[in-house]
Amino acid sequence: MMTDPLSRSHAAALDAADPLRALRDAFVFPQHGGQDQTYFVGNSLGLQPRQARAMVSEVLDQWGALAVEGHFTGPTQWLTYHQLVRDGLARVVGAQPDEVVAMNTLTVNLHLMMASFYRPSAERAAILIEAGAFPSDRHAVESQLRLHGLDPDTHLIEVEPDAADGTLSMDAIAATIAQHGPRLALVLWPGIQYRTGQAFALGEIARLARAQGAAVGFDLAHAVGNIPLSLHDDGVDFAVWCHYKYLNAGPGAVGGCFVHARHAHSNLPRMAGWWGHEQPTRFRMEPQFVPSPGAEGWQLSNPPVLALAPLRASLELFDQAGMPALRAKSEQLTGHLEQLIHTRVPQVLQIVTPADPAQRGCQLSLRVAGGRTQGRALFEYLQSVGVLGDWREPDVIRIAPVPLYNRFCDLHQLVEHVETWAAA
């Protein structure tokens, strides 16, 4: 007799056969009623890798034993500590090692990148973003325009959603880039839209922007560690991201930055700091700034070693699993959840995120029948029973099954609780 592919027993069989199942044990889960919480919020804050504590302790022990000499001696000297995460990050984002650096935080890095790559002229001064962009991106863009004496009402162009669910078609993006091409100095685009969960064809967007003579940058906050990326091959000028979501580096973690290799030895103007000076002569303390080649030349201050340690722990797990395997499981998990919703609670939940797996990561953005009031009620009920998603105003519950630690059975637990709530 065939097993129902949407049954609990089939989900348990999928979990038992999952080649990545052991990775779940590498994370610390919050507890609810003495059991692991069912956690779907890796798109907001990833779980703590168990090895993170040991790697942070290693830094603390080295600090205690060596003090300032820890910069130059010890098992992991701090002078080059940031380079311990470089190769792993390059693999995750599809870059060469010298194109990436872990530094600062996302919006700080965005400002640094715009200082170099947003170079407005009288004819070409506009910045293009998506309507409904994450507020920090919009604040950064508007402030950069004002720093150049430009009016955001005139020089900030937004691509409006052209679908009823709030998503954006590639046709709309391409048409807007073509319409405003001669005016565009910069196209700044997300890898995944934070509210809808829509993923974009980044290579195509980069090609369209560069064909119009605009610089192109990506905010990969919701894409890095979630979907396959190929920043070098896509030809993007720069990208920025955070590490506290899918990269599991902890609250307020150090950010990440990509600068394409074609800019490695350029004389681009930049906001400079001493840690961006070339390493061989940095400690001569000479007044002339000589940038390190590649992305490291945009560093300002010495790296936050304690904050980098959890990122090391997480990247080891990414290397252990590999992005292709993680993506394959992610598509299975999110597709399974989509089927469960359509089959068992279609009258309760509407999926906002595109159905095409190529246009989404692991996140499904959900609206609840009855609007915001009912949505909040369901969200709070799920919290009360130990199932954690997150809420985004005005009316979206985001659920992100993360392949590193979520199971197929978790999806059934979620949907069963939705059924219980709806029947009450």
UniProtKB/Swiss-Prot annotation:
Domain of life: Bacteria
Matches recorded under InterPro entries: Kynureninase, PyrdxlP-dep_Trfase, PyrdxlP-dep_Trfase_major, PyrdxlP-dep_Trfase_small
Cofactor dependence: pyridoxal 5'-phosphate
EC class name: hydrolase
Pathway linked to the protein: Amino-acid degradation; L-kynurenine degradation; L-alanine and anthranilate from L-kynurenine: step 1/1; Cofactor biosynthesis; NAD(+) biosynthesis; quinolinate from L-kynurenine: step 2/3
Binding, pyridoxal 5'-phosphate: 106-107, 134-137, 219, 222, 244, 274, 302
Pfam families for the chain: KYNU_C
Signal peptide residue numbers: none
GO molecular function, one term: kynureninase activity
EC number: 3.7.1.3
Keyword Hydrolase set for record: yes
Reaction(s) catalysed by this chain's protein: L-kynurenine + H2O = anthranilate + L-alanine + H(+); 3-hydroxy-L-kynurenine + H2O = 3-hydroxyanthranilate + L-alanine + H(+)
One GO CC term on file: cytoplasm
Modified residues (N6-(pyridoxal phosphate)lysine): 245
Keywords: Hydrolase, Pyridine nucleotide biosynthesis, Pyridoxal phosphate
One example of a Gene Ontology biological process annotation: L-tryptophan catabolic process to kynurenine
Role according to the record: Catalyzes the cleavage of L-kynurenine (L-Kyn) and L-3-hydroxykynurenine (L-3OHKyn) into anthranilic acid (AA) and 3-hydroxyanthranilic acid (3-OHAA), respectively.
Subunit organization: Homodimer.
Similarity-based family: Belongs to the kynureninase family.
Protein name according to UniProt: Kynureninase
